[in-house]
Amino acid sequence: MTDILIDNTATEAVRALIQAFSLVPVSQPPEQGSYLLAEHDTVSLRLVGEKSSVIVDFASGAAQYRRTKGGGELIAKAVNHTAHPTVWDATAGLGRDSFVLASLGLAVTAFEQHPAVACLLSDGIRRALLNPETQDTAARITLHFGNAAVQMPALVQTQGKPDIVYLDPMYPERRKSAAVKKEMTYFHRLVGEAQDEAALLHTARQTAKKRVVVKRPRLGEHLAGQAPAYQYTGKSTRFDVYLPYGTDKG
């Protein structure tokens, strides 16, 4: 469970949103560790003893730059966005890649199992829907709170298989800016790093119709030690493409 401190300035929209997640309301910050803070119209992640915070904001910062100046060309090639219109992001996290995929015109279903992270992402999507510059992109993202490995097979039964399953398992950040390093420190302390990568990749390959795309560091190891069918490599990032079971091209 994650503590959430609800300030008296928190709007009704924020108060209603946080009720959807398994969060523990508290009257003061914990003595150590991380917690969520709901104040005004935003939910943020805080670390005790630190002044900075983490929020999901698709209208400014890196998200705004990628939206207005371009970006995402490599990921667009990896998912073959013109031919494959539906993507399930099984490791949504703070939603950056989900937003990039949605900005390419794809219908994105995002899964996040950690309640605090899902709350942060849901809050970011909510505010993006209210902004004329981001609302069209945000409207293409549907967030599911829960374990993707469990939820995807069930969702296939009602919606059918997506064209693409996208995975971005956490890995150590290297050669990043101080701001990104601090954000990832907050994130790793909150959710930890344990992931059953083999099981996740297995479920993804069972779920996708066309391909599974895995984001990795350019020189990083293959996910679960399994070699992909092919790769798209950039300066710092690599996208490994795996084919669904029983297919020979994607």
Swiss-Prot record:
Subcellular location: Cytoplasm
GO molecular function per UniProt: rRNA (guanine-N2-)-methyltransferase activity
Family annotation (InterPro entries): 16SrRNA_methylTrfase_J, SAM-dependent_MTases_sf
Residues reported in the UniProt entry to bind S-adenosyl-L-methionine: 96-97, 168
Coiled coil: none
KW Oxidoreductase (keyword) present: no
Any one GO CC term of the record: cytoplasm
Disulfide bonds listed in the record: none
Catalytic activity: guanosine(1516) in 16S rRNA + S-adenosyl-L-methionine = N(2)-methylguanosine(1516) in 16S rRNA + S-adenosyl-L-homocysteine + H(+)
Enzyme nomenclature, EC number: 2.1.1.242
Keywords, sorted A to Z: Cytoplasm, Methyltransferase, rRNA processing, S-adenosyl-L-methionine, Transferase
Pfam families registered for this protein in UniProt: SAM_MT
SUPFAM superfamilies: S-adenosyl-L-methionine-dependent methyltransferases
Protein purpose: Specifically methylates the guanosine in position 1516 of 16S rRNA.
Similarity annotation: Belongs to the methyltransferase superfamily. RsmJ family.
Stated name of the protein: Ribosomal RNA small subunit methyltransferase J
Gene source species: Neisseria meningitidis serogroup C / serotype 2a (strain ATCC 700532 / DSM 15464 / FAM18)
